[in-house]
Each structure stands twice: as structure tokens, then as C-alpha cells.
């Protein structure tokens, strides 16, 4: 398998991350040293993608407590809880963020020690375990998804659910990397993904680095590409999946799903188990982040719309489960009926 660069890592006692806001123009490594700097990196999309956000948040907890002066476990847990609440306020939609924070807190709560130094090491150990497990999950998603795309010549993807959004390999792009390693190279059409252009800036960059042929299109060209028969599948990632199979992903995903249905093209969602939120019965319960209006009204620093108009800028939309052909996870491929099969597969039962 192609070995893509890791977007977030722990090296020589510090966090290293690619500043994704600067791609593709510059490849810049940043090193957040405080929880505030990590919060800023998450909020400003220097690190993005649900799995990568979870990893960053877990490492952010370590940055928050590594110099803790707590005298006992109770004091340490209080500091950890405060840091977790702070990091949770950075972005509200990606469930992996909250999952990772909760996992680290639970590991500390279960620790049979009152030694603060040992608890600090436990926080770091758990954060790095989340990172390593995510990479393994992405590999597994690649294996499961490859069988679904084996007969395709080209696929369309939206936003970036590749190596830059995870520990490595990605979710939606993992099957593409897996097939390439086997000698089958798919062509990829990448939506530019307005307003922040993650498809143009990130997906095309990493696929081009991998030697995989990629064609950039504007978001409003997807229907034409499908109508001409140029793609045989659509594959996207997810930021949150509810118990019934509704999928929150980057704004514009819902429209792509509708187009795929109209053109008889399978619409696949690739995501790890940590992206599922079984506490929510449907997509209408997912909080949707709304971002700075300037992201829509400006192109960089240049205004592209008149001042004083209304601007709507949700970061995500929700694709109803009925448009989803299958959900690819590290545990296997989930097909309808989703409410029943999601519960079974996540519990480790056969489909």
C-alpha cells in the first residue's frame, strides 16, 4: 500500500501536524505546545477530518495536563475534565472529537493509581493508542471497500476523507489506495468542495502525491460527470452517523447523494466505528456547525459578494439513510436495513 504522510504525529516529545490551511501551496509542520494552541488548530481547520480531530483532541488533553501540579488523582481528573470541556467547544459536529475525549477520561478514571506522573503517561499512551488504532482501522476500511470498487474505472468523492483526515490512509480514499497497491489504479473525480475547497486543496494534493490520476471539478459539475457515465461509484467520508444510518458530512454531500441516486450510481460512505453516534436516532438531532460568513463572501481576502447581504454557511449537511448504498467500516460493510445492521456490526455480530 502507498505510504502517505501522516498528518498528525508524536515525535521527540511533541505534537507535529501539517497545517492543512496552507496546502497545496506550502507543506508546513506546526507544533502545538499548549491546549490553547491545539484548540486553535482544530477550530481553524489546521487539522480537520473527524478521525484526525479526535486524535488531535486526545493529544490536546496531554498538552493540557503534562505540566499539571495536581497532588492526587481527584485533582488531576478535575484538570482533565476542564481541558476536555474546552477542547469539546472547538467544533460541535464531528463525533470523534467527543469520543476521543471521553475515552481518555475513562482510561484515567479506571486507573488504579493515585500517582499523577503515572496518570500523565496514561493520557499520552491512550492518545497514541487512538492514533495507532485509527491507522489500523483505515487499513481495514481499505480492504473492505476495495471489493466494492473492484469493477469501477472511476469514482467521485467530495471534500477530503483521505490520509489528511485521519491517522493515515483515510476512510473514503483508503479503498483507492488499497486497489492501487494491488495494481488497479482508479481515476478519481474530486469535487472542489466550496467554500473552503478541501477537495481542491487537499484531496487532489494527496492523490497527486500518490500518483493516482485525479480530475478536479467544481461542485456544480458533478451531475454532468455522472450523466456522461464517467464514474461508477461515489465514495465519501462522514463526521457523524446516527443509529438509523443518516450521515452528517461536509456541506454538499447530500446533493451529491441525490445526484447519484438519480443516475443509478452507488453511494458509499466510509467511516470507522467511532464515527457512529447511536445515542442519536436520526440526523435531525445532529448539531450542525455554522462558520464565518466571510468564508462564503470572500475568496481569500478578496470580497466576491456585496456587503450587507445575508449569508448562510453551514459546515455540514445530513444525507438521509435511504440514499446510502452501503457504509464501509473497519468491522465490515453495512447494508440496509441500517438500524438493525448498524447495531449488529458494531456489536461484532454477523450481518
From Swiss-Prot:
Coiled-coil spans in chain: none
EC numbers: 5.3.1.-
Gene Ontology MF, one: S-methyl-5-thioribose-1-phosphate isomerase activity
Active site: 239 (proton donor)
Sites where the protein binds substrate: 48-50, 91, 198, 249-250
Alphabetical UniProt keywords: Carbohydrate metabolism, Isomerase
Top-rank EC class of the record's enzyme: isomerase
Keyword Isomerase found: yes
GO biological process: L-methionine salvage from methylthioadenosine; pentose catabolic process
Pathway recorded for this protein: Carbohydrate degradation
Site feature Transition state stabilizer, where: 159
Pfam family, one: IF-2B
Transmembrane segments: none
SUPFAM superfamilies given in the database record: NagB/RpiA/CoA transferase-like
Keyword Isomerase: yes
Domain of life: Bacteria
Catalytic activity: 5-deoxy-alpha-D-ribose 1-phosphate = 5-deoxy-D-ribulose 1-phosphate
NCBIfam families the record matches: eIF-2B_rel, PRK05720.1, salvage_mtnA
Membership in a protein family: Belongs to the EIF-2B alpha/beta/delta subunits family. DrdI subfamily.
Function of the molecule: Catalyzes the isomerization of 5-deoxy-alpha-D-ribose 1-phosphate to 5-deoxy-D-ribulose 1-phosphate, as part of a 5-deoxyribose salvage pathway that recycles this toxic radical SAM enzyme by-product to mainstream metabolites.
Record HAMAP family: Deoxyribose1P_isomerase, Salvage_MtnA
Official protein name in the record: 5-deoxyribose 1-phosphate isomerase
